[in-house]
């Protein structure tokens, strides 16, 4: 086991992690770009640039850094391997959560799809999966405690609206997907080399994704009231 403190928002930190991993183990066969934060609550026009940068740097740029630092080494090894990028159902459907988070997760889905095509067409034995769950019972709602000093402070979460949102999310914990269930889905996707990892059994999520795709094809405006719960 190699534990190394890493700021995934910084390319040099992720590159140092990759170097250390290859020096210790000689190869990396499964790469999970999983670090993520929820961000500050608030409308897109209310959030500061630091609020936007914080979420996009951690949720999207971290995946880009992981791909750039690890995938070339995985290609060079020539061994069968797999990349798992954590996105969200918010990377498939807009309007359910905050703007920065949605933008970042849509980016992770697009990057994963692009990587799938690039690696496959080049003939590299590297699979790609993108994980798109709904709400999972983790501490992502408390991610403000880990906000790097580079991004300053945000007082939006201290507003009554922000506190109400946090309380509502915490009240949902008993109905959320458990991390162990997600882990089983990820391992199965690696075994079957599946691109999309979306938990089954959530009719609301499936309906929302299907409705979005139909709206795009039919050039229809989406409805303003929907749920992914």
Regions found by a protein language model. Name each.
Residues 5-16, 49:
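The beta1-alpha1 cofactor-binding region of Rossmann-like NAD(H)/NADP(H)-dependent oxidoreductases
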Residues 20-33, 40:
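A glycine-rich helix->loop->beta "capping" turn
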Residues 42-44, 51-53:
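Substrate-binding pocket helix/loop in short-chain dehydrogenase/reductase
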Residues 44, 93-100:
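Active-site loop immediately N-terminal to the catalytic Tyr-X3-Lys motif
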Residues 67, 104:
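Active-site helix of classical SDR
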Residues 88:
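Residue(s) in the substrate-gating loop at a strand-loop-helix junction
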Residues 121-197:
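SDR active-site lid
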